[in-house]
Amino acid sequence: MYKTGILNSDISKVLSDLGHTDQIVIADCGLPVPKDVKKIDLALTLGQPSFLEVYEVLKQHMEIEHVTIAEEMEVDNAPIFEQVTKDFSEIEQVNHETFKALTKNAKAIIRTGEATPYANIILQSGVIF
């Protein structure tokens, strides 16, 4: 049994399997999951766990070279937008419909209990060397 780090075996496995440019998504509880994409459902109740709780943990354990968000997040979810833009200087913003289409390329979508609009992000894996 792990003493530290990510205890969720599905998330741990997905992260360890990521190669350069592979993508995972952290999603609010409302984002549709394409049928051929692995869904890791962490949602317990509305708001738990939050997007930011999951995001902060993944940031610590993943080499991230690129992020994509829905442009609507800037206006409709300023608190999460501010945190993400504080962490990454370059962020690709696309409309929400395009964002949803891009999720079909993800290795996995991690569904949180987040219940605020547009609390979704695509994280693209970098390399550690």
From Swiss-Prot:
<dbReference type="InterPro" id="IPR023064">
    <property type="entry name" value="D-ribose_pyranase"/>
</dbReference>
<feature type="active site" description="Proton donor">
    <location>
        <position position="20"/>
    </location>
</feature>
<dbReference type="InterPro" id="IPR023750">
    <property type="entry name" value="RbsD-like_sf"/>
</dbReference>
<comment type="subunit">
    <text>Homodecamer.</text>
</comment>
<keyword id="KW-0119">Carbohydrate metabolism</keyword>
<dbReference type="GO" id="GO:0016872">
    <property type="term" value="F:intramolecular lyase activity"/>
</dbReference>
<feature type="binding site">
    <location>
        <position position="28"/>
    </location>
    <ligand>
        <name>substrate</name>
    </ligand>
</feature>
<dbReference type="GO" id="GO:0005829">
    <property type="term" value="C:cytosol"/>
</dbReference>
<dbReference type="GO" id="GO:0062193">
    <property type="term" value="F:D-ribose pyranase activity"/>
</dbReference>
<comment type="pathway">
    <text>Carbohydrate metabolism; D-ribose degradation; D-ribose 5-phosphate from beta-D-ribopyranose: step 1/2.</text>
</comment>
<feature type="binding site">
    <location>
        <position position="96"/>
    </location>
    <ligand>
        <name>substrate</name>
    </ligand>
</feature>
<dbReference type="InterPro" id="IPR007721">
    <property type="entry name" value="RbsD_FucU"/>
</dbReference>
<comment type="function">
    <text>Catalyzes the interconversion of beta-pyran and beta-furan forms of D-ribose.</text>
</comment>
<comment type="similarity">
    <text>Belongs to the RbsD / FucU family. RbsD subfamily.</text>
</comment>
<dbReference type="GO" id="GO:0019303">
    <property type="term" value="P:D-ribose catabolic process"/>
</dbReference>
<protein>
    <recommendedName>
        <fullName>D-ribose pyranase</fullName>
        <ecNumber>5.4.99.62</ecNumber>
    </recommendedName>
</protein>
<keyword id="KW-0413">Isomerase</keyword>
<keyword id="KW-0963">Cytoplasm</keyword>
<dbReference type="Pfam" id="PF05025">
    <property type="entry name" value="RbsD_FucU"/>
</dbReference>
<dbReference type="GO" id="GO:0048029">
    <property type="term" value="F:monosaccharide binding"/>
</dbReference>
<feature type="binding site">
    <location>
        <begin position="118"/>
        <end position="120"/>
    </location>
    <ligand>
        <name>substrate</name>
    </ligand>
</feature>
